[in-house]
Amino acid sequence: MYVSADLIWLAVALPLAGFLINGALALWRPDAKSAVSVVGPAVLLGAFAVVALIFRSYALAGLATPHVVHLWTWLPAGALSVELSLLVDRLSLVMLMVVTGVGSLIHLFSVGYMRSDPGYARYFAYLNLFVVFMLVLVLGSSLPVLFIGWEGVGLCSYLLIGFWYGDKANADAGKKAFLVNRIGDFGFMVAMFLIWVALGSLNFLEVAELAPRHLAAG
């Protein structure tokens, strides 16, 4: 059965739905641990299944050409038009298998490990959201979209590291991780600016095509 790469958005949408459901339960039904125990891991297993089917289709068809899934134009600003698009190729599919596969195992382990914690639903909401941003980071077809994923992963790292914020050491560790990531943000934004000035594009496929010519021209 051939599964089109156009369906890769489902791999992101499923854990996003898990975040919304578990987030709502954390706010209004924090004691609904049975529902959280099902929703949290199920959305990750579903995402893994979607990725695995697309990976299998790519492998059987011997596809090597990158496939761009356009969702919508995010920033139509003259020459700089940033599209919210997902880039599917062999490398991204391998990384998606890792993210959703390992993520599923972590979610399943957490069902037992975190069961007695009063913030159970909140924890799974954060964990689902962490995977969402990891997938955006891997799938982003341009530097701005990748940057969204990067920022989201940094935010979720802060939330998860400082999850038991009642302990000062955990709260401080979360703040430290958040601040250190801001150093990376600065370098990332400077690099994006320089690439835009030099090549006039932040799209990965366009940059890969333009960069060799730019370097050859000196």
PLM features: what roles do these ranges have?
Residues 1-218:
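...captures the hydrophobic TM-helix bundle architecture rather than a specific catalytic motif
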